[in-house]
Structures are given as structure tokens and as C-alpha cells.
Amino acid sequence: MEKVQFSVQINAPVHLVWTTMLEDASYREWTSAFQEGSYFDGSWTMHGVLRFLAPDATGAPSGLIGRVVEKRTDEFVSVEYIGQVVDGVDDTESERARSLIGMRENYSFSEENGVTTVTVDQDTSGEMAAMLEDAWPKSLAALKELAED
């Protein structure tokens, strides 16, 4: 397992950045760099299950399943992956799904003098690392634009 880290400084209060990152409508906008049509289904509450989805080539929802394992509003949220969604069906048993179990995606937020720093720390495997290296900087730039607008 590899770890990747990305960060951005945003000229906006931390609560605004937190809300922009995690609310449904704005989430759909800033995550489009990962895949057009990206969205989540579920809840960012402690122990909430989230499905991070986008339409696959046939239009069926596909993506990752995670559980919120730590949350401090306006400071930190950690999602641990527990499987994947393939063709609209939850999969926690295939080899690919099992390889995801236990990987984490963490968002840290800190504010100083009206500038919020968002840091993303994510576990990954070799096959996903290149995609993350490409998509996260674009997504964080979109988040910055949304929060500063």
C-alpha cells in the first residue's frame, strides 16, 4: 500500500470550506476531475456509510464504499474503505474489493488568518496512484474556486 498527500490553501473560513467539500451539490462539482458525474450516496456522520459513485461505461453506478471512522467538524474526517460498487451492486468479497478494505482517505482542515489549508492523505495501490496524482490537484483547485467564489 502506498500513501499520497495533497493540499491546498483556500482564502475562506474553515467552516465554509468544510461545507463546500462535503455537501452534495458542491461535492459533485469539485469531484468531477475524478470522473464526470461523480457523487456520493450516504452520510458523513460518524460511522455513516458512503458510496462514492459515478456512472460507468454502461451508465450503471460504480465506485467505492467507505465508512466514516473519525470525524471532528471543521477539523478532520477519515473514511475507511469497506468495498466497491460494480454495476450498481455492492461488492465486498471479490479480490479487488478485498484489496480496498482498510484503505483510508483523510481530510484535514486548519485555518489561520482567514486562510484554510485542506490536506488530503490517502492510501492507494499502484494502479490508482497515477489517477490520484492527476485528479486530486485538479479537484482541490476546483474546491478552492468554489469556496472562494
Where are these regions (language model features)?
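Intrinsic-disorder/low-complexity, polar/charged segments enriched in Ser/Thr/Lys/Arg/Asp/Glu/Gln
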Residues: K3-Q9, V14, V49, G63, ...
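A conserved amphipathic terminal alpha-helix motif
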Residues: R98-I101, T117, D123-D149
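Short coil-to-beta transition motif at edge beta-strands of beta-rich domains
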Residues: W44-F52
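Hydrophobic ligand-binding cavity/cleft-lining segments
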Residues: M1-S38
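Short, solvent-exposed aromatic-acidic interface loops
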Residues: I82-D87, D121-E127
